[in-house]
Amino acid sequence: MVCNSIIESIGNTPLVQLRRLFGRADAEVFAKLELLNPAGSVKDRPARYIVEKGLTEGAIGPHSHVIESSSGNLAIALAMICGLKGLRFTAVVDPKISPTNLKILRCYGAGIEQVTAKDSQGGYLETRIERVRQMLREQRDAIWINQYANPLNWESHYYGEAAEILAQLAQPADVLVLGVSTSGTVHGIARRLRKAWPSMRVVGVDAVGSVLFGQPSQARELPGIGASRVPELLCRDEIDEVIHIDDYTAATACRRLLAREGIFAGGSSGAVVAAIEQVLHATPVSHRPLRILTLFPDRGERYLDTVYDDAWLARIAARRAVPNLAALPTVASLIPAGVSA
């Protein structure tokens, strides 16, 4: 197939069975590799869906200024898509944005609006959103994507990954394990799959320190999972179980995923791997394989200064009081025998 632009290559990502990672003969784990989307993440889908639907229906015009509060994957996806559509795009970011993401956004030609004041939760999300609202008041042509409240967010996953999974997976999944942040991904996929597989259990994976499911706010470093405010889209009663994963556990699971499956994924992927390990630990051995479905949202290259940096992991481990720092899984220790660093 020949695409007319890079935008048309979004989606149709592979579904891969993880045969080496979990060591359970009575479990089949399948991961949809959203990290293979052209701008590097699952956020390519809502970015395309929301912008194209807005252009078609008139909510976005040829001279619109698209704005979003995002320091990461959605901002990058919007920068790529808006650039190709001839639209101006500005990402409202905060001091926690990684140098890599900032460089990527600038390469795509995005405008950068950075806030510096912390909000009442000690983070920056509310401050960023207030800056977006200020820009909307000041600029008549400004359009806010608003991923936390926009139903087009979850619709993009309902018509996107969920439809593809139904075509890719021959047998129903017993358990869906997905990270939660805006909640668009988990709701869009679960709502579509449950129509076909009504007995499927949905496990949401949240970050320790996130307030999504009633925990107190704490410092956390990995983006892409959890939030410091509850999104308007979140329907807690549609999620059967929630597992909280801390930064250290997510990072070490990322390293196991890379070592055993060769999948170089971002921090939230490690969180879902760690959550699946907990699900399997709590599941008795059975003659019928437990079929688990998950999704890896983004690429590991954006986490070279965190998840895959040994000094960063040691700092996180010390904060968590890991007893044996000398036994930390370094990047070098993950390289298979016979392969040079």
From Swiss-Prot:
The UniProt record lists the keyword Transferase: yes
Name of the gene: sbnA
GO MF term list: transferase activity, transferring alkyl or aryl (other than methyl) groups
Similarity comment: family membership: Belongs to the cysteine synthase/cystathionine beta-synthase family. SbnA subfamily.
Covalent S-S links between cysteines: none
Family matches, as InterPro entries: Cys_Synth/Cystath_Beta-Synth, P-phosphate_BS, SbnA, TrpB-like_PALP, TrpB-like_PALP_sf
Function: Catalyzes the synthesis of N-((2S)-2-amino-2-carboxyethyl)-L-glutamate (ACEGA) from O-phospho-L-serine and L-glutamate.
Keywords: Pyridoxal phosphate, Transferase
Binding site for pyridoxal 5'-phosphate: N73, S181, T182, S183, G184, T185, S268
Protein name as catalogued: N-(2-amino-2-carboxyethyl)-L-glutamate synthase
CDD domains linked to this entry: CBS_like
EC number: 2.5.1.140
Subunit structure: Homodimer.
